[in-house]
C-alpha cells in the first residue's frame, strides 16, 4: 500500500440510508465565502446564509464525511440535508441549541 492510497471496494456505497432528507435553497448574502462541513449542524451556520433555518433544525449536509460545501458571495444553490442520528443532542457550534433536539 502507498501512503495516502485509498482502497475502496467495488460498487456503490449508500450513505444515510433510511434517514429523512430535505432539500433547501441556500444563498450567501454576505461578502465573503462561507464553507460548511459535512457534520456541522446546518441550523447554526453563518447568519449570512439565508434559507428556511427552522426547517434545518437537527439536520446536516447529506455529503460524505470530511467534505464540505462552499458558498461564494451572492451564490445560491440547492442543498440536501439529512437528519442527525445518534442521541440527537447538539452542543457547541453557534450555541443555539445546547441540548436535546427532540
Swiss-Prot record:
Localization recorded for this chain is: Cytoplasm
Main subcellular location of this protein, as a coarse class: cytoplasm
The record's catalysed reaction(s) read:
urea + 2 H2O + H(+) = hydrogencarbonate + 2 NH4(+)
Which Pfam families does the record match to this protein? Urease_beta
- Can you list the GO cellular component terms from the UniProt entry? urease complex
For this entry, list what GO says about its biological process: urea catabolic process
Q: Which molecular function terms from Gene Ontology are attached?
A: urease activity
What are its E.C. numbers? 3.5.1.5
Pathway membership: Nitrogen metabolism; urea degradation; CO(2) and NH(3) from urea (urease route): step 1/1
Give the keywords, sorted. Cytoplasm, Hydrolase
* UniProt subunit comment: Heterotrimer of UreA (gamma), UreB (beta) and UreC (alpha) subunits. Three heterotrimers associate to form the active enzyme.
Question: What name goes with this protein?
Answer: Urease subunit beta
What gene, per UniProt, encodes this protein?
ureB
Amino acid at each position: 500500500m502507498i501512503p495516502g492510497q485509498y482502497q475502496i471496494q467495488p460498487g456503490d456505497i449508500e450513505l444515510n440510508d433510511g434517514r429523512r432528507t430535505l432539500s433547501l435553497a441556500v444563498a450567501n448574502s454576505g461578502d465573503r465565502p462561507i464553507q460548511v462541513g459535512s457534520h456541522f449542524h446546518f441550523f447554526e451556520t453563518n447568519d449570512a446564509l439565508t434559507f428556511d433555518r427552522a426547517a434545518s433544525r437537527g439536520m446536516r449536509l447529506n455529503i460524505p464525511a470530511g467534505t464540505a460545501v462552499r458558498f461564494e458571495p451572492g451564490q445560491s444553490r440547492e442543498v440536501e440535508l439529512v437528519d442527525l442520528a445518534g442521541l440527537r443532542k447538539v452542543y457547541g457550534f453557534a450555541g443555539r441549541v445546547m441540548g436535546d433536539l427532540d
